[in-house]
Amino acid sequence: QEQWNEQGVKTAKELKKIVRNLDTTRLITAGMNPPVNMENQDVTLQFDKANVNYNVLAASGVLDLVGYNYAHKTFEYHQQNFPKTPFIATETTSGLQTRGYYDQKSDTLKRWPIRWDIPFDGGNSNNTVSSYDQVSTPWGSTHEETWKIIKKHDYLSGMFIWTGFDYLGEPTPYVWPSRSSYFGVIDLAGFPKDVYYMYQSEWTDKPVLHIFPHWNWEIGKEVDIWAYYSQADEVELFLNEESLGIKKKEGDDLHIMWRIPFKPGSLKAISRKDGNEISC
């Protein structure tokens, strides 16, 4: 709570002095949680207006670099509220996935639980969370939601994800017998979840083409097929060598999707740039 009063500013000054005595080269920040006033607001909502009420520490000028935990819809207003102070998103997303599990349909965003302080009685009976990037906590966002905002504005310097790896404890949105978190883009065994490839397609120069989910469903069931790709203009999807059409990213979307009825066989995707095959 001290970040919301003058004690927080005083403590920050004391800590900054200690750090400066040891290291004069690095910027000093704090992960403010939350950076804006959430009082009397439904916690399922994020601020989307420029006149947000920032906490005292954020507005004090003590920090070299303002750090935001969550509140992703306020990011784009940072420059007009703090024109001389750099920004970094110190904790973001809290997206939820279980590797290898997929709920249909995939184009509906879900916030699980509805509120952090209300017991969760929804979700899946086997305590899984869809591995499509469609579920997050109410205080967070999907990975695509936050990265699109950061990517759009040059004055937003970057983001730290909650989290890189799953870990034991905090099995949000579930309770026992769940024991592992669902937050990681890599699971406890070290295997990447699908959203890992979204970041790979955005943050590296490596040609990426990743399609999912698995291809083992009930005959006739409609299945959403996603693809993350980079270094290419388009992707063509094939089932048993029959084309299911060419897709391109639209607007600021970071993935493409086909919705098709399942039938047994082999899926294949080909990405192309200027008509030349890049990945298969």
Task: Specify the residue positions occupied by each region the protein language model found.
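Extended substrate-binding grooves/exosites of carbohydrate-active enzymes
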Residues: 1-250, 255-276
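Short beta-strand elements
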Residues: 279-280
